[in-house]
Amino acid sequence: MADDPHNTSTSDVSELVPDNTEPSAANVKEDAETTAARRELKQTTISDKAKRDSAQLSQEDDKSASEEDDNKSDAGEPEKKKPRTSRGLTPEVQLAAPKQEVPKETVASPKKRTHDELEQDGKEEEEKKEGEKPSSQNRAERDEPEKKRPRDRQASLSVERDGQKEVEPLSAQESRPSSAEKPKIEEKKDESKDTKVDKPQTSSSAFANSSMAKFASSTTSPFGAFGAAAAGKTNLFGLPATSSNIFGSKSADASAAPAGPPKLSFGSASAASPFASLNGQAGGMSSLFKSPFASAFSGGSSALKTAGATGFGKPGEPLKTGKSAKPFGAPESDEEDEGEGEEGEENKSENGEGEEKEEEEKEEKASGEEKKKFKLQKVHIDDGEGNETTLLSVRAKMYVMEKGVGWKERGAGMLKVNVPKQAVEVEEGNQPDADSFDPAALDDAARKLVRLIMRQDSTLRVILNTPILPAMKFQVNHKLKAATVLFTAFEGGEARQVQMKMSQANATQFSNMVEKIKEKLAAA
């Protein structure tokens, strides 16, 4: 078991631990803690040695396996898996400095470019554009306002003139062409001179020989020559030559005869123009465009005037009305007053008829509305209390004892103590006097009218109607907020227990009133 790394036999321990390290028990007595520490030290040393041996064995196995693979590859034999006799441990990883790998130089694709190359190309293009852009002298020609330059750029050249140094501004230095650019500018000037074309020059003799000089030498307007040449001829529209207006205004010479009627240019020569009849009948009017309706406004002779037609705008004719003319401010005549009176009466009669119709319509509407409304009449209802007088009325809530259920609420209303009218005297203000009650004058039937009656609110349904007898007992129970009155009531010949809940003041007042009536009934 030499190959077993975990073998902890005594022979191995004796080899690893020297003889002098373990003292004898006879010389030194060890305590329990020292013994445990010593044994732990032995175990750690044994395990460290086993680890070193296993690492050496695994390295030797790897070397032998690599040598066998090389031999087999040289001989051309197929590799066979060899079963491992022992399990090797994984060797420890040795960390070493990484090798610097040199990247291979590869040709990048023109489509795939790095971000730095794109930025570099963009900067180069911007520099080219800035170099090509001419420096503008005027501030208005620049795209952006001129920024302040640092002081070191404001240095200017000094020029000696007359023994003194003058500072030349930087703008003049920039605008001044360099020595290399001067020959180019001179060449461009020579080329521009050669390309110039001689322009024709004018002279006074050439203008005098032209046809326009005649108009310039004459004192009259150039268009006056045409008027002078046409003197003595008839006008284009057939008017006499003496008329200056081509539209046939009245001639200054009244003795000039009007022109004859124009002839048609086609057809027979003797046929006159159909438009000549309008112009030929107008005496003294030579306008070709004279309207036949103008005579009605101007009073001149025209074709319509000869036919007897008159215009509505004839001057001198007064306006015609139904009434006779009278001077301004004159009093009105009696006839006019009578006419106006008749008209006023007619208007009044019409207005009166309209008012009567309106009144009739209103009455009809009112009658219809009255028919629609319900006519409510006061109806007398006999509640059976007409011959009785109420001595006391208090508000209470009634409870009735039901078999198998207990107290059951029947309703709430006014609890009244009624007696016949003939048994009570009435004081001033129709208020009965309870002390004046005398049951001696009552018969047996009237005595039954001394009773307790109660009606439910809103519906007025009778929920209690019992006579008061001398033998009845009324028991009052006072509580914190209210009081109850317990008694026996008679309904349909049956006796039922009734409980009335009311305020303490009302309970006291009710019990006092009932006790007085019981006493008087018992005495009678």
UniProtKB/Swiss-Prot annotation:
Compositional bias (Basic and acidic residues): 28-80, 114-168, 179-199
Pfam name, any one: Ran_BP1
Membrane topology recorded in Swiss-Prot or TrEMBL: Peripheral membrane protein
Region described as Disordered: spans on this chain: 1-219, 247-284, 300-371
Biased composition (Low complexity): 248-277
Record has Cell membrane as a keyword: no
Motif (Nuclear localization signal): 37-44
Main location group: nucleus
Domain (RanBD1): residue spans on this chain: 377-475
Keywords annotated in UniProt: Coiled coil, Membrane, mRNA transport, Nuclear pore complex, Nucleus, Protein transport, Repeat, Translocation, Transport
Record's comment describing the protein's domains: Contains FG repeats. FG repeats are interaction sites for karyopherins (importins, exportins) and form probably an affinity gradient, guiding the transport proteins unidirectionally with their cargo through the NPC. FG repeat regions are highly flexible and lack ordered secondary structure. The overall conservation of FG repeats regarding exact sequence, spacing, and repeat unit length is limited. FG repeat types and their physico-chemical environment change across the NPC from the nucleoplasmic to the cytoplasmic side.
Described function: Functions as a component of the nuclear pore complex (NPC). NPC components, collectively referred to as nucleoporins (NUPs), can play the role of both NPC structural components and of docking or interaction partners for transiently associated nuclear transport factors. Active directional transport is assured by both, a Phe-Gly (FG) repeat affinity gradient for these transport factors across the NPC and a transport cofactor concentration gradient across the nuclear envelope (GSP1 and GSP2 GTPases associated predominantly with GTP in the nucleus, with GDP in the cytoplasm).
Subunit record text: The nuclear pore complex (NPC) constitutes the exclusive means of nucleocytoplasmic transport. NPCs allow the passive diffusion of ions and small molecules and the active, nuclear transport receptor-mediated bidirectional transport of macromolecules such as proteins, RNAs, ribonucleoparticles (RNPs), and ribosomal subunits across the nuclear envelope.
Name the record gives this protein: Nucleoporin NUP56
Classification lineage: Eukaryota, Fungi, Dikarya, Ascomycota, Pezizomycotina
